[in-house]
Curated annotation (Swiss-Prot):
NCBIfam families on file: reco
Gene of this entry: recO
Full protein name: DNA repair protein RecO
PANTHER family per the UniProt record, alphabetical: DNA REPAIR PROTEIN RECO (PTHR33991:SF1)
Domain of life (superkingdom): Bacteria
Taxonomic classification: Bacteria, Pseudomonadati, Pseudomonadota, Betaproteobacteria, Burkholderiales
GO cellular component: bacterial nucleoid
Alphabetically ordered keywords of this record: DNA damage, DNA recombination, DNA repair
Stated family: Belongs to the RecO family.
UniProt function note: Involved in DNA repair and RecF pathway recombination.
Single Gene Ontology BP annotation: DNA recombination
InterPro entries: ARFGAP/RecO, DNA_rep/recomb_RecO_N, NA-bd_OB-fold, RecO, RecO_C
């Protein structure tokens, strides 16, 4: 059987680790092939043309070949656009990468999610800190919806009853969306949940969901954190714990 070769494929490096003295294994998120593993041979040599560009949060066009689970990187070209983020922006990007590594199966294409990820990376690189948190929440919602882990947000999950605009509801990992009391500070009104659901199916879902998230940031964040930790099988994601540790050191 002929070896398949893919060329000019939009991609981001999610993670990299040593494979040999001169080579790396890359976990890459591609637009048309989903998350894949590539071996970058000789990339650690000073003369390698790949060495300065195989970085996270940078849009690449790659070529690769092979029929095994781990393919071989043949070419990579940086597409430009922005410099490497630093500080909180960099940690936010690495957090997104950890979510993709944990929740996406290999060789499962998600073209819409790739496009959303590209938009979030642009927000991260822009240095607009005031919208960064809303962008992260929007990506979390769109990721969960894309992979089938987010219940409908315009109905109670267990009963499928429509939400009352004035009542309060919480999103819980094992029960979905359910009614709660007014004293629950992490809850949202029915009208707010419906607005989030409508944003997810908008023709421009990232922009619409970012806008909707900005209105409910304080209440939404802990609910999404609990849901993501549940599906990732951890109490705290590694990058989130690193951010907590760094913040404590700066106090």
């Amino acid at each position: 059987m002929a070896t398949q070769r893919i060329s000019d494929e939009p991609a981001y490096v999610l993670h990299r680790h040593d494979w040999s003295e001169s080579s790396l294994i890359l976990e890459v998120f591609t637009r048309h092939h989903g998350r894949i593993a590539l071996v970058a041979k000789g990339v650690k040599r000073p003369s390698s043309s790949f060495r300065p560009i195989l970085l996270p949060l940078q849009l690449l066009h790659v070529a690769f070949g092979g029929d095994a689970e781990i393919r071989i990187l043949k070419a990579a070209e940086w597409q430009g656009g922005h410099v490497m983020p630093t500080g909180d922006a960099l940690m936010s990007g690495l957090y997104l990468n950890e979510l993709l590594l944990t929740l996406l199966a290999r060789d499962d294409p998600h073209t819409r999610l790739f496009d959303v990820y590209t938009q979030v990376v642009q927000v991260i690189a822009s240095g607009h800190g005031e919208v960064l948190q809303s962008a992260l929440r929007a990506f979390e919602l769109l990721l969960l919806r894309e992979i089938g882990l987010l219940p409908l947000l315009d109905a109670q999950t267990m009963t499928l009853l429509a939400l009352d605009p004035e009542s309060r509801y919480s999103l819980v990992p094992e029960g979905g969306l359910r009614q709660t009391n007014d004293a629950d500070r992490a809850s949202l009104s029915g009208a707010q949940w419906v607005a989030l659901q409508q944003s997810l199916v908008d023709s421009a879902p990232f922009t619409a969901t970012l806008r909707a998230c900005s209105e409910v940031m304080t209440q939404l964040k802990p609910q999404l954190r609990a849901l993501l930790n549940y599906h990732c099988g951890v109490q705290t994601l590694r990058t989130r714990q690193m951010m907590i540790d760094l913040q404590s050191l700066s106090l």
